[in-house]
């Protein structure tokens, strides 16, 4: 589901609490880049700089994720596909309702700093 959003240069809006917990907001879209040099890497870094998201949809490519280690990056990749699917399904019923940023901030802080500790 996420490559379709990358093809449209459409970020994944933060519409479920699990997404607020894991990504701290929407999953952004990075620029188009030609494979073969460091353009994709630079685009990923520039897009995620200043963002809490561990995922980016690179325009016309698809999702890229980062993490503390490989397992964490794979967890983020699985979550990207799950939330992309959720948004796609919810759009069949109408426009999904984004979580207000103040609530996203509270959810992210609780999950990252309190939950499970």
Regions found by a protein language model. Name each.
Residues 1-117:
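Glycine-rich flexible loops
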């Amino acid at each position: 589901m996420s490559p379709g959003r990358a093809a449209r240069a459409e970020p994944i809006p933060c519409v479920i609490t699990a997404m607020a917990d894991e990504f701290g907001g929407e999953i952004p879209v990075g620029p188009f880049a030609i494979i073969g040099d460091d353009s994709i890497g630079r685009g990923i870094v520039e897009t995620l700089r200043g963002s809490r998201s561990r995922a980016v949809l690179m325009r016309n490519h698809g999702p890229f994720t980062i993490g503390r280690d490989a397992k964490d990056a794979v967890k983020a990749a699985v979550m990207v596909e799950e939330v992309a699917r959720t948004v796609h399904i919810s759009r069949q019923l109408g426009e999904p309702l984004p979580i207000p940023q103040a609530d996203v901030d509270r959810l992210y802080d609780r999950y990252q700093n309190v939950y499970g500790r």
